[in-house]
Structure formats: structure tokens, C-alpha cells
Amino acid sequence: MRISKPHLRSVSIQCYLCLLLNSHFLTEAGIHVFILGCFSAGLPKTEANWVNVISDLKKIEDLIQSMHIDATLYTESDVHPSCKVTAMKCFLLELQVISHESGDTDIHDTVENLIILANNILSSNGNITESGCKECEELEEKNIKEFLQSFVHIVQMFINAS
């Protein structure tokens, strides 16, 4: 019975060994290439996607249900499609306020994970410059529940665009 690991790159260690032994790289450099190849075969692919971001947002929403956090956050409730990256960056900045105000380690860890995921996705799309968009401080202040609902809405805009 063969156990499959879907997140591992399909790199055969035997191929590296064969290439190493049958080539002129029988030097220290060749051994380094072989060792690095072995390590890379075991590394999981880290492809973040917006579905994971929504999952983390739902988790944050569930975690704050039992707390009373009286914070208002800059919230973009009517995002224009040409300003969605700017709005997303504002949401990510405001998310750190939730992490700080809650003082909860689960919320902190989930927020950190969400920020890393979203930033990875945004950076993989390249540097997009948007003009004519509102600054974070110009946005309306809303409670956490409305903030999270608007956040989910903007993430869905990214999902629908891809």
C-alpha cells in the first residue's frame, strides 16, 4: 500500500542520486546539490488562497463571540473594484487592532496567520498601484462584527476576480 502526500513536490530522490553518481559533480558542490534536492523534495508547497483567509476570518468571528471588545475599526463597506488592494491593506492593518484589543493568544495566532496568507497572495500578484482610493483613516469606523462582514465581502471580490 502506497501512502500519498499531496502537498509534497514529486521529486524522486533516486533521480538525484543517479545524476550525482553518474556525473562529474562528485565534489563538495555536487553533494550540496544532492542534499538540497533531498530537502526540497520534503518541503510542502505553500500556496495560499483566499478560501483559507475566509476560514481564518470565520474563526476570528467565532473566537470574539465570547468576548466584549468595544473597538471601532476603519471599514470600507463599499469597495470599488479598482481599489480592492488598497482596501485589503487597510483591513489587514485594522486586523492587528483586533489582535491587540483581544489579548487572546488564539486570536493573535489566527490574525498573524491570516495576515501572512493575505500578504503572500497580494505579493504574488505583483506591485499593484491604485490611484484615487481612500486612505485608511478616511474610512468609516464600524464595530468588529460589521468590520468582519465587510472583510469577508472584499475577500470574495478577490475570489470572484480569479
UniProtKB/Swiss-Prot annotation:
What are the entry keywords? Cytokine, Disulfide bond, Glycoprotein, Secreted, Signal
Q: Which residues form the propeptide?
A: 30-48
> Which positions carry the signal peptide feature in this UniProt record?
1-29
What PANTHER family would the database entry show? INTERLEUKIN-15, INTERLEUKIN-15-RELATED
Q: Mention one GO biological process in which this protein takes part, according to its record.
A: positive regulation of phagocytosis
* GO cellular component entries: extracellular space
Extract the Pfam families matched here: IL15 (PF02372)
What is the protein named? Interleukin-15
Example of a GO MF term: cytokine activity
Q: In terms of domain of life, where is this protein from?
A: Eukaryota
Subcellular localization, per the record? Secreted
Give the similarity note: Belongs to the IL-15/IL-21 family.
Cysteines joined through disulfide linkages: C83-C133, C90-C136
Q: What job does this protein perform?
A: Cytokine that plays a major role in the development of inflammatory and protective immune responses to microbial invaders and parasites by modulating immune cells of both the innate and adaptive immune systems. Stimulates the proliferation of natural killer cells, T-cells and B-cells and promotes the secretion of several cytokines. In monocytes, induces the production of IL8 and monocyte chemotactic protein 1/CCL2, two chemokines that attract neutrophils and monocytes respectively to sites of infection.
**Chief location of this protein within or outside the cell:** secreted
**Native organism:** Macaca thibetana (Pere David's macaque)
> Which residues does the record list as glycosylated?
N127
